[in-house]
Amino acid sequence: MADNACTAPAAGTANALTGRPEWPAWIERKRIDDALTAEAYEKAGPTCRAAIKTATAMFMRYDAPAREVVHEERTDPSSGFWRSRTVFPAPWAVVAFTPEYTAAARLLGAVMPAIITGVPLIAAVCVGGIPSEPLLTALDLAGIEDIFSLSDVELSALLEETQPGPGRLVLLHTGRLDTLRLQARGLHVP
């Protein structure tokens, strides 16, 4: 893994041809098979799917995705000071959870801010296994296509590859991912 980490671009690095950010090449081997997501989607049934789609639509109703860069300058000639700031979406976001985690509504609550603010690269990472069917269905309906199964060590490697970077990490767990929380704090990943 370390060899791949040295040669692959960091998460959020733009592809030379498309200009869009992308995940490092090594993570593709850890992508969850689309067949699992399709199976979970079918098992969920129309009522469940409608509820999830309604929830995501409610998020969008109040805050449509804004993939914009805002540059603001303020000057105060009397004091001689000025301030300049640029606001833009983070280049990447990772929502990580364990295989035991099944709260689809909370997962949507964790991933929707990244969608709404226009984060171009969003990954859902199940640490140590395969996501539950309710989570796969929710991710599919939210439009999250980058769903991976990584070990603690692999997620740590991904976080280290993003440095220095202003991405975001959301951990949904009941204590099992505390080591990753501490590592993210040490790397200054919010």
Where in the sequence are the language-model features?
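N-terminal Rossmann-like NAD(P)+-binding subdomain of aldehyde/semialdehyde dehydrogenases
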Residues: M1-A90
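General structural feature for long, well-ordered alpha-helical segments within catalytic domains
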Residues: G19, A44, C48-M58, P89, ...
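Hydrophobic/basic alpha-helical segments enriched in Actinobacteria
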Residues: K30-A40, V127-I130, L135, F148-E154, ...
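Hydrophobic, Leu/Ile/Phe/Ala-enriched alpha-helical segments that form helix-helix packing faces
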Residues: F59, D63, A110-V111, L139, ...
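Acidic/glycine-enriched edge-of-secondary-structure segments
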Residues: P65-V70, V94-F97, I147
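Conserved small-residue-rich beta-alpha loop and adjacent elements
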Residues: E73-T137
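Short, structured coil segments at secondary-structure junctions
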Residues: G118, A142-G143
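Conserved NAD(P)+-binding/catalytic subdomain of aldehyde/semialdehyde dehydrogenases
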Residues: G143-P190
